[in-house]
Amino acid sequence: MKVFKENKQFTLFSILALIVVGVAVFAPQIAPYDPLDAVMLESLQAPSSAHPFGTDKLGRDLLSRVIFGTRTSLVMTLCLVAVIFVIGTFLGVIAGYFGGIVDGVIMRIADMMISFPGLVLAIAIAGMLGPNLVNAVISIAAVSWTKYARLARSMVLRVKKNLYIEAAVVNGTKTWKILLVHVLPNMVTQMVVTAAADIGTMMLELASLSFLGFGATAPTPEWGLMLNEGRTYMAKAPWLMIYPGIAIVICVVVFNMLGDSIRDVLDPRQE
């Protein structure tokens, strides 16, 4: 409770993030219509009392699709962040602790990945794998783990210098136990803060791939795909792009600000 009282920004954006999560969890109860129900006679209707966000080219209720899009976007984003967190942290810890050729190989691969524009490389990988959300997650993860690996490596190198690590090695403590008991607890906070701050960015990248045709496929209710479908009718039915775009902006801002707030709470030295 003390944290919430002292950090109003953290409190505000925690509440907003919980609202977003609530919308995702209770989408079937909140949405007025089935997001996949097509009624061609009601296609491209402007916002009204029956359809507050209007309808798309197939007569599907846009509000329902935006609500269900929250679930799709949030779930896939959290999966993406979890994947790059685990892979990046694992490789970074291995590189930092063992050093030598292991460190050299992992860091050279990371440097090679960083030398390419991330989104361009992700598009290339997604193009080879084929368009769907799972492949989009794989594509972005393939180019995004490097940040976590470099951060984890630098923290392991710092922790390795402590005398208790040397004492554990001298006492014959197994490597896996040293990593789990002495190394990871000293770096997990910073890694979690980084992951929390990345949620908004990863959500935007997933939406970007879907917008470009390399992510979600029809009829999945996903914000990036909805923007892609709506751009054809931008002059005739601008609401097809306005509402999914607003949803993306709101969620990205909320989770970016929440990530900054978590950084301030867990690591006040960063303020």
Per-segment meaning from a language model:
Residues 15, 21-58, 212-220:
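Hydrophobic alpha-helical transmembrane segments of membrane transport/permease proteins
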Residues 62-97:
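Transmembrane alpha-helix signature in integral membrane proteins
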Residues 64-77, 127-147, 239-245:
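Loop-to-helix entry region at the N-terminal start of transmembrane alpha-helices
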Residues 1-33, 109, 187:
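N-terminal signal-anchor/first transmembrane alpha helix
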Residues 143, 189-199, 238-271:
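C-terminal transmembrane helix and the adjacent membrane-cytosol boundary/short C-terminal tail
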Residues 52, 56, 87, 96-97, ...:
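Generic hydrophobic transmembrane alpha-helix motif, especially the helices
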Residues 126-128, 140, 155-156, 205-247:
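Glycine-rich helix-loop "coupling/hinge" segments at transmembrane-helix boundaries
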